[in-house]
Structures are given as structure tokens and as C-alpha cells.
Regions:
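Extracytoplasmic/periplasmic beta-strand context in beta-sandwich domains
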Residues: 18, 86-88, 131
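Glycine-rich beta-strand-centered segment in the early N-terminal region that forms part
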Residues: 21-39, 48-82, 89
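Extended, non-globular alpha-helical segments
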Residues: 32-36, 94-124
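Mid-domain Rossmann-like dinucleotide-binding core that forms the NAD(H)/NADP(H) cofactor-binding site
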Residues: 108-110, 114-155
Length: 155
């Protein structure tokens, strides 16, 4: 399979287009043929090894993907790394079904920010329909989605 891989940390100049062996899923895992991979803040920092968790080389970046399983299901998943490849192995329990009305661009691009915004608005904030709320940094990916989720919830 084709993949973007880093042998040394850096920006886009460190990306190498390589051939790798197809990954093999183990028990409780599923192979996902990647159709889209999101690019977010964590991805750009993981390639420089200056984010939360120390990265190991060689590294195939890409934390959020959309794609198809061998049985034809459309899924999205947060994978940590490996999304910049044609195929990635994902724990079955971490796959999210993608409904027909959501395309793969939307599923992969909104996964990390969308789950974060949903958790903030639905689980942490107390939203009372009709009341106003303030969302700091509403111009960013997570903030923009948080505004939309809060509005749909009645704020």
C-alpha cells in the first residue's frame, strides 16, 4: 500500500511517499481502506514530535480517518497515527458508522473537532434552552462546531 511516512521529524519536507506492507488486523480489530484523512493541530505537531505524546519513527501520521471496511461498511475512526496510508487497522470498538447523508470529507474532517465540541457542549456545559452562552475561540474548528451544536440544543 502507499503511505506518507517520516524517517525523521519535520514539516512537509520530511514526508516520504512510500510502499508499505498492508497492515493485518488482530482480534477485535478491523482493516479500514482509507478514503479521507483529516489534518488537525495534533497531526501537524506530531510530525515535529513536539505535541503531547512522544512519537516513534518511522511515523505514518494521520489521526482521524474515514473509509470502508472489507464488508463494505462506511466508518470513521480516531486512530492516533497511520491515517496517511491507504489502509489502517482500527479497534472495532473505536469505529463510528458514517450515515449516508454525511460524506467522507465531512466524516474525516470533523471527527476530532466534532467529538471534542460535542463533549464540551453536551457533557460539560449546562445548556438551558433560551439562555445565552459564551464560547471562546469560536472561529476555530472546535469552537465553530461548538457554536452549531449549542445553537441546535436551543441556546
Amino acid at each position: 500500500m502507499k503511505a506518507i511516512q517520516l524517517q525523521e521529524f519535520g514539516g512537509a519536507e520530511a514526508f516520504q511517499y512510500v510502499d508499505l506492507e498492508d497492515p493485518t488486523p488482530g482480534d477485535g480489530e478491523v482493516l479500514v481502506e482509507v478514503t479521507r484523512c483529516g489534518v488537525n493541530f495534533a497531526d501537524t505537531h506530531s510530525t515535529r514530535n513536539d505535541y503531547l505524546a512522544e512519537q516513534q519513527l518511522p511515523l505514518v501520521p494521520g489521526a482521524e480517518v474515514a473509509g470502508r471496511t472489507p464488508d463494505g461498511r462506511r466508518v470513521a475512526a480516531l486512530v492516533g497515527s497511520g491515517g496517511y496510508a491507504e489502509k489502517v487497522v482500527v479497534p472495532e470498538s473505536l469505529t463510528i458508522p458514517v450515515p449516508d447523508e454525511v460524506d467522507d470529507d465531512q466524516a474525516a474532517g470533523a471527527l476530532d473537532h466534532g467529538l471534542t465540541a460535542m463533549a464540551l457542549v453536551k457533557r460539560i456545559a449546562v445548556i438551558v434552552p433560551g439562555e445565552s452562552i459564551a464560547i471562546e475561540a469560536a472561529a476555530g474548528g472546535t469552537g465553530t462546531l461548538a457554536v452549531q451544536i449549542a445553537k441546535a440544543a436551543g441556546s
